[in-house]
Amino acid sequence: MNAHSSLLPICKKATAHIAFSKAPSGISYVSRQEVGYPFHLGRTLKLPQDPPGMAAIYLQSCSGGLFAGETLHLQLHAGPHTQVHVSTGAATVAHSMLEQPARQTVTLIAETGALLEYLPMATILFPQARLHSVVNVTLHPNARVMLCDAFCLHVPPGSAGLPGFYRADLHIRCPAGTLLAGDRLALTGADLQRRLPGVSAELQALATFMLVGQDLPVDELKRALRDALRVVPESYLGVSALPNDCGVSVRIMTADAVALRSALHLAWACARQQLTGIAPRVRRK
């Protein structure tokens, strides 16, 4: 895993490509799946308090997390007028990385009229973890995308130290490739250890949540999200409009993973309520 042997296999690439279509009955379904190790795709679920016809799937890792030198690529393609919810069955562990960092790239394509929710659980950063997370969104007319990118820290018994770094790059583009909005985050373990007031203080779990789409009632969404998140204790919260009329962004920082998960559910439930009129219940995982 992290041995110093020169024979260690690194720079491994793994890909999962999942596409969704809408049946004549109105039900969304998985119409294509090419899923390689370490990804595992569960069966499609129909969950209570989801919009009618929505397909819900859970991705899992068969390898036990992210390791040094890995390059993972996940592509989700929501066809016209589909409704799709994608999450993970558990949090992903980014293990200590002594040789090389890991990279995870997620490509989200939402075609005309689609609703695509990509809401994985937070990544858990172990000491010396070094992870670069990239999310690329292609937004077609009248499409809506909900997404989050989140991490928290954990030191297993018998271990010590800080994460190396967490870097996140997010790009939202139109089908022609024009950049509509971008977000960039870079933090090191040393940054968090400083615990600067107004920057991170004692907080060690961070998430970015976005509702992406054009012609949304942005001011109404910002008010609703701020009201929904007021109840989150001991947190830093920020809600802002994305440029080029492409949605709303929420930054959340909390003391731990439990509070972060609760805050992300509140943000998701609020956004889903505003879009569909139906708020989702808390999912047991």
Swiss-Prot record:
It comes from Pseudomonas syringae pv. tomato (strain ATCC BAA-871 / DC3000). Pfam families: UreD. Keywords: Chaperone, Cytoplasm, Nickel insertion. It is found in: Cytoplasm. Disulfide bonds: none annotated. Belongs to the UreD family. This is Urease accessory protein UreD 1. Required for maturation of urease via the functional incorporation of the urease nickel metallocenter. InterPro entries: UreD. The keyword Chaperone applies. GO terms for cellular component: cytoplasm. UreD, UreF and UreG form a complex that acts as a GTP-hydrolysis-dependent molecular chaperone, activating the urease apoprotein by helping to assemble the nickel containing metallocenter of UreC. The UreE protein probably delivers the nickel. One of its GO terms (molecular function) is nickel cation binding.
